[in-house]
Amino acid sequence: MKLREIVARNLRQLRNAKGLSQEELADRADINRNYVGLLEREQHAATVDMLEKLAAVLEVDPIDLLRARD
């Protein structure tokens, strides 16, 4: 599985677990909502800085966005 796919799946799962829309996550992370959509559709690779912002809003360690899950 590609890292981009892992990040997309984890981001979507963690966002949904927090009950956040893409727009709410983007607002709280101070990023563009379209960017969140691109990440979740595997159309863009997140930077390390972006992973940190998203993880902070989701209240997880950034590595949780990169970790493959079964």
Region spans (language model):
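A detector for short, charged/polar N-terminal pre-domain segments
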Residues: 1-6
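DNA major-groove recognition helix of helix-turn-helix/homeodomain DNA-binding modules
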Residues: 49-64
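Recognition helix of helix-turn-helix/homeodomain-like DNA-binding domains
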Residues: 31-44
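Conserved hydrophobic/aromatic packing and binding residues within compact polymer-binding modules
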Residues: 11, 25-26, 36-39, 65
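Short, conserved catalytic or interaction motifs in soluble domains
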Residues: 41, 60, 70
